[in-house]
A protein has these predicted regions:
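Transmembrane beta-strands of outer-membrane beta-barrel pores
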Residues: 1-4, 20-22, 29-35, 64, ...
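Short loop/turn motifs that connect adjacent beta-strands in outer-membrane beta-barrel proteins
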Residues: 19-23, 65-79, 110-123, 186-192, ...
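Solvent-exposed loop/turn segments connecting transmembrane beta-strands
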Residues: 2-10, 174-175, 201-209, 302-306, ...
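Long, internal scaffold/assembly segments composed of regular secondary structure
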Residues: 119-124, 132-255
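Outer-membrane beta-barrel "beta-signal"
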Residues: 57, 380-398
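C-terminal structural cap/anchor segments
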Residues: 245-335
């Protein structure tokens, strides 16, 4: 049967945050928009999207591009650093690895003329997430290293010590995912065009670009002079290479120098069997199908070799009515170790309408209709949602 969904109610976001100049510090569960992709029109960041519920974190960040001194306004940067633990459950009741620790960081640099005289700008950055520590319910794995020295190892992406598994001693301690992000933008008077690429890495073979073009390729067009079509996004996501099928690290490196690697198996890990997920949903791109859709009830990602095409657009019908449309054409071939005999494909659609009454300040009313066709997520399905929201201060104190 199909894995049951989590039917419990929960608070999606709850956090405290303070800021001083360009620095912000937050504690709690908060949706974060860190990377180059648009948070509302993109198919989702490959490393850290908002597909899963927000992870409780202690986070320090410079969330907006800030000018680097002595660069005459040409160089800006932003980034963040956080750490916490994943109180994760699978299918709402099972815990395979208890008290898993979590680390995430990012840094981006942008070359841009802040005076607006030069139309081109470029961005380069890196994102890094790690699952580490914890105690596996599998007695063959058991408790994982979790000392402060091990924390330094996972932050730096270093090999594990003598108390780590053989795989982590050969490769790196913990379950790591990294993306190298690149962007180039042309800004005209009434429009802008931006291209971007997220190169997905699972280990050193990916960091050396041995996994080909795996990742997310995107184009974003902004049209400020056309309110009925303000923004258009096209994305191509491919994860079929994965540094080729074989993970050849089990050889004598002294007798046979050279790099092992291959069989990257994105979002999966031998020690952390629920993979790069939180409460059954992918922390990264939703196009690598989340464990909650596994029909056999097994943990992990069973469809991480994909080739997908995504379109998103938004605009305003009037000063008070806006819309958003998303369409994704999906193809999946299973995994490198468990390929599908026949590929699965499907199309996902979303239409979203928002209305703001001119006399009700801060209030917004909306509705969405979505549909999945094909067999990527199991059977075809449709759904809808209604939303009422209020933005602003509950009470202002003077």
């Amino acid at each position: 049967g199909v894995t049951p969904r989590d039917k419990h109610a929960y608070i999606h976001q709850l956090y405290a945050e303070i800021g001083y100049k360009c620095i912000e510090v937050s504690l709690g569960s908060k949706e974060r928009y860190l990377s180059l992709v648009d948070p509302f029109l993109s198919s989702g960041d490959m490393i850290y999207s908002n597909n899963a519920r927000p992870i409780p974190e202690m986070n320090i960040s410079i969330p907006r591009f800030t000018t680097v001194p002595l660069t005459k306004g040409w160089l800006q940067f932003k980034g963040n650093f956080d750490s916490d633990y994943l109180s994760d459950q699978y299918a709402g009741k099972y815990t395979f690895v208890e008290h898993v620790l979590w680390h995430q960081k990012s840094v981006y640099f942008q070359i841009s003329d802040t005076r607006g005289d030069f139309p081109l700008s470029g961005t380069v950055g890196v994102q890094h997430i790690v699952q580490w520590g914890g105690t596996s319910t599998n007695p063959k794995i058991g408790e994982q290293p979790h000392s402060f020295k091990d924390f330094v190892r996972i932050v730096l992406g270093a090999k594990g010590g003598g108390d780590a598994s053989l795989s982590d001693q050969i490769n790196v301690l913990g379950s790591h995912h990294i993306s190298f992000d690149f962007g180039l933008k042309y800004q005209a008077k009434d429009w802008s065009l931006r291209g971007y690429y997220q190169h997905l890495c699972y280990d050193k073979s990916g960091m050396e670009f041995k996994n080909g073009t795996d990742g997310l390729w995107g184009l974003e067009l902004n049209l400020s002079a056309f309110p009925w079509l303000k923004q258009f996004v096209f994305e191509y996501v491919t994860t079929r290479n994965q540094s080729r099928p074989f993970h050849d690290i089990w050889f004598d490196h002294d007798k046979h120098p050279g790099r092992g690697g291959g069989g990257d198996d994105y979002y999966n890990n031998g020690e952390y069997v629920t993979g790069n997920s939180y409460f059954n949903r992918s922390v990264g791109s939703p196009l690598l199908v989340s464990p909650e859709y596994n029909t056999d009830g097994a943990p992990g990602f069973q469809n991480n070799r994909v080739r997908d095409f995504h379109f998103g657009l938004k605009g305003d019908f009037s000063p008070h009515v806006s819309y958003r449309l998303l369409l994704t054409a999906m193809n999946t071939w299973g995994t490198g170790t468990a390929p599908l005999l026949k590929k699965r494909d499907g199309i996902s659609l979303l239409a979203d309408i928002q209305y703001q009454h001119p006399k009700l300040k801060g209030w917004q009313f909306g509705g969405s209709v979505g549909a999945d066709t094909g067999d990527v997520f199991g059977n075809s399905s449709t759904g809808f949602s209604l939303k009422v929201s209020k933005r602003g201060l509950l009470k202002a104190y003077k």
